[in-house]
């Protein structure tokens, strides 16, 4: 084995190790909580992935799955988007002094262009921003928010009918 061959094999080993680490990080995707109620109440037109500004005890609670997105919504303050009314339970193994407020307002981390677009959609078009799901992406906790239009009662009934028809078609095709 000559010098160049040895150098080439070690370089390839380093590249493959880096590639394996990248593949392992991308493979981790774990849904922690989902807002199924939002899909029933709103017609979701577009979804956006956002980061959340969290405290340490909130991260622990979310990883345990003790988060409720059902009543949550987003609002604008001082050019920022805040996540309001999302309940993250206090962590069990921490004393009350170090724990967080379960319903505190949390800042969403988005690019300025996305914030401007969302603000335009909510103010001009009368749409609502709703949290849809919260999940782990690698080691980061991410939130999927949706731009939605509220459904009326007849829209909900029509969606139920369409769902029933699809279900009947699937059962008929299985036979």
Swiss-Prot record:
Disulfide bonds: none annotated. One of its GO terms (biological process) is trans-translation. GO terms for molecular function: RNA binding. InterPro entries: SmpB (IPR023620), SsrA-bd_prot (IPR000037), SsrA-bd_prot_CS (IPR020081). HAMAP family: SmpB (MF_00023). Belongs to the SmpB family. This is SsrA-binding protein.
């Amino acid at each position: 084995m000559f010098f160049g061959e040895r150098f080439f094999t070690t370089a390839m080993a380093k590249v493959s190790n880096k590639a394996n680490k990248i593949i392992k990080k991308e493979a981790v995707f774990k849904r922690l909580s989902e807002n199924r109620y939002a899909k029933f109440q709103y017609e979701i037109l577009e979804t956006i992935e956002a980061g959340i500004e969290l405290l340490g005890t909130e991260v622990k609670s979310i990883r345990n799955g003790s988060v409720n997105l059902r009543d949550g919504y987003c609002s604008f303050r001082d050019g920022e988007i805040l996540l309001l009314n999302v309940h993250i339970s206090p962590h069990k193994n921490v004393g009350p002094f170090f724990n967080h407020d379960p319903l505190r307002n949390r800042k969403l981390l988005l690019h300025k262009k996305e914030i401007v677009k969302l603000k335009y959609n909510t103010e001009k078009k009368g749409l609502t921003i709703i949290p849809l799901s919260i999940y782990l992406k690698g080691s980061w906790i991410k939130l999927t928010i949706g731009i939605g239009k509220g459904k009326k009662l007849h829209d909900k009934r029509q969606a139920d009918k369409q769902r029933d028809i699809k279900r009947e078609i699937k059962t008929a095709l299985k036979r």
